[in-house]
Amino acid sequence: MSDRRRIVRAVRGIRGEVEFEASVEPRFDYGRRSHRLHVDGTAAVFEANDQRLQLTSVAALERDSDDVRSRFTVRAGDTSGFVLESGASGSPHQIGDGEVIRLFLDTGAYWQRWPEQSSYRGRWREAVERSAITLKLMIYAPSGGLVAAPTAGLPEQVGGSRNRDYRYTWVRDGAFSVFALLGLGFTEEATVFGEWLRARVDERAGEGSGPLKIMYRIDGSSEVTEETLDHPRRLHGLASGADRECASDQLQLDVYGEAMNSIHALDSGALRDWGVGHEGWQHIVAMIDWLCAHWHDPDEGIWETRGGRRHIVYGQLMSWVALDRAIRMAASRSRPRTWTAGAARGTASTPRS
């Protein structure tokens, strides 16, 4: 699948006359990597190693150090705009005001049509549909990964130090989103993340450290390390350094319950192009077998504690959910099952915190 993505900005004059100034200031690798810039009339190309951004404009562009600016006047009836594209190769093509408006209107039309497939007919429908649109925008289409939040440095507390980059995929957050999307009738988006999740189960089946990581990069890779970025400039007098979030090596037992809850929902929903085959079922069996051996272990839990592992009831409850959903899947498809007794024992022997 192509990694080409475009941001379209259209400027239309309604009445009067307005002096307009626009700037494009990209920063690669959290601002740590310098880039090359080439500006030619109404086009500009930003390049940093293997990353490339291409900017085309109706109005003329001018270089401002490593950035690009455009100054123009908009009068009633005038149209101008910009297209910023990633992944494009070759030289930028000249773009006219008509093409900018077409791209803008086509994009708007798509997002107006998309909620029509929703099955939701309850109260506050507009707010619900806007929330669904936000969830869809958080899906990385090439892989199906769903980011926990589209933020990269908002502080948990004003003036605080925990400015996390949440543009990673947490199994827990993604699983919750599957249920939200399924409940609203957006089965395609739910299925896409289900495929992403099933691939993670398949690739880690039988590994001694546990079949699942709690979080991944959006492309599905698990090479995630925590890193503090001290170099960003101060913003509004507050420290704006960002932390690349990482608790990826923690044990959080609840993710198995959330993952299996989602897989069961998709498997039992008779969705087109979804199904757990023989090999996939064997990988699920390996995951549940591992969980049966470890679900009474202390863990860092849903709160990602940094002070050592402890028994957390929520994680052990969700471990039971994982066993329950696996048993249901086995029963509904006449698959082998061996965990019924383990699930029954677990309800009577959950350790206290």
How does the language model describe each region?
Residues M1-S353:
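Acidic, mature catalytic/reactive cores of soluble proteins
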